[in-house]
Amino acid sequence: MGIKGLAKLLSDEAPDCIREVELKSLHGRKIAIDASMAIYQFLIAVRSGGPNQQATMLTNAEGETTSHIQGMFNRTIRYMTEGIRPVFVFDGKPPDVKSHELIKRREKREKAQAALAVASEEGNVEEQDKQSKRLVRAGTKENEDCRKLLTLMGVPVVTAPCEAEAQAAALCKAGLVYATGTEDMDALTFATPILVRKLTFANASKSMVQTMNYNKVIEGLAISHDQFVDLCIMLGCDYCDTIRGVGPKTALKLIREHGNIEKVIETIDRKKFVVPESWVPNEKKLDAQSDDDDEEGVESPSKEENNGIVDTEELIPAYVQARKLFNEHEVLNDIELKWKPCQAEDLQKFLVDDMGFNVDRVKNNIEKLQAAYKANSKPQTRMDSFFAVKANPNAAKSAAKRKADAAKAKAAVSKKKTKKH
């Protein structure tokens, strides 16, 4: 899911962090790509169908889905032909606190399944396409298929211990790659120096991609890294609920004024804005203990009566756990990235015999892959000045507004301190 509303907020409040560039401007760059995100997009985009027919995923003779293989094979060759060296990072085990988000996704798929049944019965092709895409999920088989494909292509594959975006960001911060390639905005929350979006959509007719610079995000929003993490949590992330009624602009205003979530909770109008119970678990526990004490004068068990054991885990606010995940995510540090020549014979066998691809097209694409590998293996000089960058028309206006808002927030804090004294 990423971070709700962050892309729009950055476009409005920190436009200098965003650049629209041509795919070829990334020539000579190594990019860590979120594999699960790419596979999901290929499953949605690579489909067959005609007029008045529901679009369906590509399959082989055995009925096995091959859309992800088709998309991954062609797009990886496109990257390498443009001089880009891709590294695909796969998700590991999701963090425990993400379970509530996974449950929500499952519920959404169940609703989509019911809506698809209705659309099919009514013969509504457009609605069938819409709901069938909502049912798409990159499962274990799709991930294993792509791991095998990429290995045969000679492209590095990394399996993260946890979230792929966090691992990709770590590779970027370590200088092993230039950027993280994903649509998920939480790559910025993990502090990837450069985020590249729209990579999966880039093709011959639409070659522009979007880059975001982390340092310019922080500079443009006029907040610190820790405040940015808290802002992202308030906007809405995969790891916890957020304050109901607080939109992106209000969240930024509150973080600028108060500095962190703890102080926001202390000062926010709780009648107007609903703070999740998981954010204030101590309040709920204290209320429960108070109610128990009020009933017939019965006191709650003391620490001594519980053999000195106090359940502190449930007292950790959800946003604190989310904050820790963003700042201390489990990643692999000892990684060596190697691009190798493709295993042409085994690759052709996998694509033609196992996946049912056209042999002539496969041979032609393998030749392109081999040529790209040979070209990319030579020392290369980047020529950034030759590539045009699309300027953001709102940059000057947003910069002035940002400075004014920051000044107001600073003045408000000073005023509150003066009143206290």
Swiss-Prot record:
Keywords associated with the record: DNA damage, DNA repair, DNA replication, Endonuclease, Exonuclease, Hydrolase, Magnesium, Metal-binding, Mitochondrion, Nuclease, Nucleus, Phosphoprotein
Cofactor: binding comment: Binds 2 magnesium ions per subunit. They probably participate in the reaction catalyzed by the enzyme. May bind an additional third magnesium ion after substrate binding.
Biased amino acid composition, Acidic residues: 289-298
InterPro entries (alphabetical): 5-3_exonuclease_C_sf (IPR036279), Flap_endonuc (IPR023426), HhH2 (IPR008918), PIN-like_dom_sf (IPR029060), XPG-I_dom (IPR006086), XPG/Rad2 (IPR006084), XPG_CS (IPR019974), XPG_DNA_repair_N (IPR006085)
Binding site residues for Mg(2+) 1: 34, 91, 163, 165
Positions of region (N-domain): 1-109
PTM comment, free text: Phosphorylated. Phosphorylation upon DNA damage induces relocalization to the nuclear plasma.
Annotated Mg(2+) 2 binding sites: 184, 186, 238
Coiled coil stretches, renumbered: none
Keyword Transmembrane: no
Binding site for DNA: 47, 75, 163, 236, 238
Region (Interaction with PCNA): 379-387
Localization terms from the record: Nucleus, Nucleolus; Nucleus, Nucleoplasm; Mitochondrion
Domain of life: Eukaryota
Single GO cellular component term: nucleolus
Region annotated Disordered, chain positions: 284-307, 398-421
Cofactor(s) this protein cannot do without: Mg(2+)
Pfam families per the UniProt record, alphabetical: XPG_I, XPG_N
Residues covered by region (I-domain): 127-258
GO molecular function, one term: magnesium ion binding
Gene Ontology biological process terms, A to Z: base-excision repair; DNA replication, removal of RNA primer
Its EC number(s): 3.1.-.-
Subunit structure and binding partners: Interacts with PCNA. Three molecules of FEN1 bind to one PCNA trimer with each molecule binding to one PCNA monomer. PCNA stimulates the nuclease activity without altering cleavage specificity.
Record-stated family: Belongs to the XPG/RAD2 endonuclease family. FEN1 subfamily.
Role summary: Structure-specific nuclease with 5'-flap endonuclease and 5'-3' exonuclease activities involved in DNA replication and repair. During DNA replication, cleaves the 5'-overhanging flap structure that is generated by displacement synthesis when DNA polymerase encounters the 5'-end of a downstream Okazaki fragment. It enters the flap from the 5'-end and then tracks to cleave the flap base, leaving a nick for ligation. Also involved in the long patch base excision repair (LP-BER) pathway, by cleaving within the apurinic/apyrimidinic (AP) site-terminated flap.
Record protein name field: Flap endonuclease 1
Name of the encoding gene: FEN1
